[in-house]
Amino acid sequence: MAEQMVFDADQVTAEVAEGIEKIQNASNLEELKAIKTTYAGADSAMTKASKAIGSLPADQKKEAGKLMGKLRADFGRAYGPKEVELKEAAEKAALAAETVDMTLPVSRKPLGARHPLPKLMEDVEDFFISMGWQISSGPEIEAEWYNFDSLNFGPDHPARQMQDTFYVKGNQAKDAAGFVGSNMVVRTQTSSDQVRALLTRGVPLYIASPGRVFRTDELDATHTPVFHQCEALAVDKHLTMADLKGVLDKLAVAMFGPEAKTRLRPSYFPFTEPSAELDLWFPDKKGGPGWLEWGGCGMVNPNVLKSAGIDPDVYTGFAFGVGMERTLLLRSDINDMHDLVEGDVRFAEQFVMGE
């Protein structure tokens, strides 16, 4: 049973006041971000109170809304300047720790190194090209129809909510396929390229769509608001789950070595039916050999094929997607997403040029 939301003005006011006091006493950025998560994150009293406004009598909603607006503004006014202050302090400390003695002889210019993430994405592209597949790339600013409607997401699906998806101002953008989107979003998945490719390339179709996607996640050790996926789509006559499993097994071996193997667990995704979670086993897994979740997959939902004007009684298809950052973390000793996005040259130097 879902937890019943109760609006308690005194409680949320006290919680926000406590959060503001802790903001003022924060000594570093990590502590400050943790305070924001606790007092303004998805599980905070402030967020729960905002959601509970909908259950209030009509004559109380206006005052409750004003109160929540004021509390959020107070929290933001305390958080913003403190964040600037702590960032400046951190930068000064970093500069002080990295001072250079200008009287020392000049050292040899160090060799550069490629960032491991684009190198991994090229490896994945090479795998699909070796099988005769095409590489496809859709736009990052996408029509909501391609990102959700064409993939069988219902109008009330939680993924459409603004706390999960970035919506873009300005609409009615016409694309190459002639579709006019009523809303524009920053794509949340490279699956948005599926129906676009079916409309522009036709069938049979075998494509891989690697690229950046965007979610409203906070940057932490395991999440980032901008990350990379590779979506694979095959549509042809007589394709089955056996074909899907065969491609997944080959990809696992290409990425993790000859002993790697995959298994499928029943799951649910709007754009596939049946759907499965993709698990991976390989001997070099951190902590020893074992199974762990790698991605999602399944047979293309007939409604997705119909969105592209394809007869699901004639054609079938399979699709799967894996996260590139997750794949990289599994293949290396990297343990923190911050290392991938901060642009520290010392991180890239750990990876040999051309590997």
Swiss-Prot record:
Residues annotated as binding Mg(2+): 273
Pfam families documented for this protein: Phe_tRNA-synt_N, tRNA-synt_2d
Enzyme Commission (EC) number: 6.1.1.20
Stored Gene3D superfamilies: Bira Bifunctional Protein, Domain 2
Keywords: Aminoacyl-tRNA synthetase, ATP-binding, Cytoplasm, Ligase, Magnesium, Metal-binding, Nucleotide-binding, Protein biosynthesis
Annotated family: Belongs to the class-II aminoacyl-tRNA synthetase family. Phe-tRNA synthetase alpha subunit type 1 subfamily.
Compartments (UniProt record): Cytoplasm
Enzyme class: ligase
Catalytic activity: tRNA(Phe) + L-phenylalanine + ATP = L-phenylalanyl-tRNA(Phe) + AMP + diphosphate + H(+)
Protein name per Swiss-Prot or TrEMBL: Phenylalanine--tRNA ligase alpha subunit
Subunit structure: Tetramer of two alpha and two beta subunits.
Superkingdom per UniProt: Bacteria
Cofactor entry: Mg(2+)
Cofactor-binding details, from the entry: Binds 2 magnesium ions per tetramer.
Cellular component, GO annotation: cytoplasm
